[in-house]
UniProtKB/Swiss-Prot annotation:
Keywords: Ribonucleoprotein, Ribosomal protein, RNA-binding, rRNA-binding. CDD domains: Ribosomal_L18_L5e. This is Large ribosomal subunit protein uL18. The gene is rpl18. GO terms for biological process: ribosomal large subunit assembly; translation. This is one of the proteins that bind and probably mediate the attachment of the 5S RNA into the large ribosomal subunit, where it forms part of the central protuberance. The keyword Lipoprotein does not apply. GO terms for molecular function: 5S rRNA binding; structural constituent of ribosome. The keyword NADP does not apply. GO terms for cellular component: cytosolic large ribosomal subunit. Belongs to the universal ribosomal protein uL18 family. It comes from the Archaea.
Length: 192
């Protein structure tokens, strides 16, 4: 560690790898709400947050665990779940009267077609106005899980049971994932 009078210590949250203050300042400067997307190992979280004098205020929130309560049988951290979580958050935001937001991906790298941008596409498809470039969004077939379906079809029966044991435990064949995705999206439209 550096010593001496010229050494400058970074902010605690920056040292902990939690906050990029330069990016946060630019987002706060816009005066718009933030669409905050966080991907954990097992879940996806999407929130609409406003900056306040006494700290940030969460206006709307959606968690991929809530998809299971709506009947989602797939994984809660895959691209399809990220899209549906963003879609659910976008629908709830519109219901609360929030029409515009700025994407906040935190310290995650902006990788084309990633889960973060799948959640963004979900929020945009729900009707939320979020500035973005079309080139970063994943394609529709990937969001619906068609790549998983194709992979599952290429496996033999024993290998399929081994690789997709959790899906089969829950009563969902990976071959039926795109239809199941459409069904849950329709259910979100009806319930929210």
């Amino acid at each position: 560690m550096a010593h001496g009078p010229r050494y400058k210590l970074a902010f605690r949250r920056r040292r902990e790898g939690k906050t990029d203050y330069r990016a946060r300042y630019k987002m706060v400067e816009t005066g718009k709400s933030r669409l905050v997307v966080r991907i954990t190992t097992y879940h996806v979280i999407a929130q609409i947050i406003n900056v306040g004098m006494n700290g940030d205020e969460t206006l709307v929130s959606a968690h991929s665990k809530q998809l299971q309560k709506m009947g989602w049988l797939g994984g809660t951290s895959n691209t399809a779940a990220a899209y549906l979580t963003g879609y659910l958050c976008g629908k709830r935001a519109l219901k609360e009267g929030i029409e515009e937001a700025v994407l906040d991906i935190g310290l995650r790298p902006a990788i084309r077609g990633s889960k973060v941008f799948a959640a963004l596409k979900g929020a945009v498809d729900a009707g939320l106005n979020v500035p973005h470039g079309e080139s970063v969004l994943p394609d529709e077939s990937r969001i619906r899980g068609e790549h998983i379906m194709e992979y599952a079809e290429s496996l033999d029966e024993e290998e399929l049971r081994k690789r997709f044991s959790k899906y089969l435990e829950r009563g969902l064949s990976p071959v039926d994932l795109p239809e199941h995705f459409d069904e849950i999206k329709k259910r979100i439209d009806e319930e929210v």
